[in-house]
UniProtKB/Swiss-Prot annotation:
SMART domains: HTH_ASNC. Changing R218A: Does not affect didecarboxysiroheme production. Shows a reduced ability to bind the substrate analog Fe-URO III. It comes from Hydrogenobacter thermophilus (strain DSM 6534 / IAM 12695 / TK-6). The active site is at H93. It comes from the Bacteria. Keywords: Lyase. Pfam families: AsnC_trans_reg2, NirdL-like_HTH. This is Siroheme decarboxylase.
């Protein structure tokens, strides 16, 4: 299959268009029949190369409060604590990384539940974790995984548009709730959603387009199993960057294809790094070389690479469900 296979993998990681027959549009771009494209995508899912295809929503613009959390856990207790963290419906990613703070997870807390810091404190107390970090986003430079490069040092342009939060209507929340699952692999996928929402296909596409215009809907795309797609190494790369240089350095780092996420985050006395980038490569040496290149080019002497050694959890959060509230009630009553 070769080149055709690569084209399909590349195109479904970008942005599935908001039109009645999106797979027909993609099939034309690849140069194959729509039916063949759909069968190939189904096979990629079955073979464990594609993790899922789904709408990707911005948790902040949905009204959720989120942060990157790090726990310092005794090695003999790591799996136990990781399993506890995994049970939280607001945790989408949870990894063991090569650092004294060895358990890193992303947490999103629904509006009107509790303060995020209180949730983290209760989680830490429950598992007797004495040392932890709450690292919030200050500035976003890049977000979006596209594993379609030979070298992580390849460059690309990045959309840096900043969106303002406006509360969602109840109808918009329902649209998010219904569409956030796996994207239907049929000729008219939006019609499947529209039937469940009891609205016309045209009306749904119009409303999804409006959500995309506001940044609430980032895109609809495939997420791959990195290792099975050949990208066996990933690291959270962190730098200590002077405040007056962080905009320039952040944009520079975000321009590398091997960087999927790049943020400025809040710091702590225990963790002074303020610029974070997730790097992916076909081996650790590729990532080390890219981090060294960035550090040398931008004269940054203080940096670290936190390689992922174990993936404990990687899922999509179910927005506007009652799962988090039930879990939180159990947490505070324990």
């Amino acid at each position: 299959m070769g080149n055709e296979f690569d084209k399909i993998l590349k195109i479904i990681q970008k942005d599935i268009p908001l039109v009645k027959e999106p797979f027909s549009v993609l099939a034309q771009e690849v140069g194959i029949e729509e039916g063949k494209l759909l069968k190939t995508i189904e096979k990629l899912v079955e073979d464990g190369i594609v993790r899922h295809i789904a709408p990707i929503y911005d948790s902040r613009l949905l009204g959720y409060d989120s942060a990157l959390i790090a726990f310092k856990v005794d090695r003999q207790k790591l799996e136990e604590v990781a399993n506890f963290v995994n049970a939280c419906p607001g945790v989408s990613h949870n990894y063991e990384r090569t650092h004294d703070f060895n358990l890193w997870f992303t947490l999103a807390v629904p509006p009107e539940i509790s303060e995020l810091e209180d949730v983290v404190r209760l989680m830490a107390e429950r598992e007797r974790v004495k040392d932890y970090l709450v690292l919030r986003v200050v500035r976003l430079f890049k977000i979006g995984v596209k594993l379609d490069y030979e070298s992580p040092a390849e460059k690309e342009s990045v959309d840096t548009k900043v969106y303002t939060y406006t509360p969602l209507t109840e109808e918009e929340k329902r649209i998010v709730s219904i569409t956030q699952g796996s994207f239907p692999l049929v000729e008219r996928p939006f019609l499947e959603y529209a039937k469940r929402l009891r609205m016309s296909e045209e009306e749904l596409l119009e409303k999804l387009s409006a959500l995309k215009e506001r940044g609430v809907l980032r895109r609809i795309s495939a997420v791959l199993y990195h290792r099975r797609a050949g990208y066996v190494a990933n690291a959270m790369s962190v730098w200590e960057v002077p405040e007056d240089a962080i905009e320039e350095v952040g944009r520079y780092i975000a321009g590398f294809k091997g960087v999927s996420h790049c943020y400025q985050r809040t710091t702590s006395e225990k963790f002074r790094y303020n610029l974070f980038a997730m790097m992916h490569g076909k081996g650790q040496e590729e990532i080390k070389l890219l981090a060294e290149t960035i550090s040398r080019e931008k004269a940054l002497s203080k940096y670290a690479l936190l390689f992922s050694t174990r993936e404990f959890k990687k899922v999509r959060i179910k927005y506007f469900s009652e799962e988090f509230e039930r879990w939180f009630k159990e947490l505070i009553s324990a």
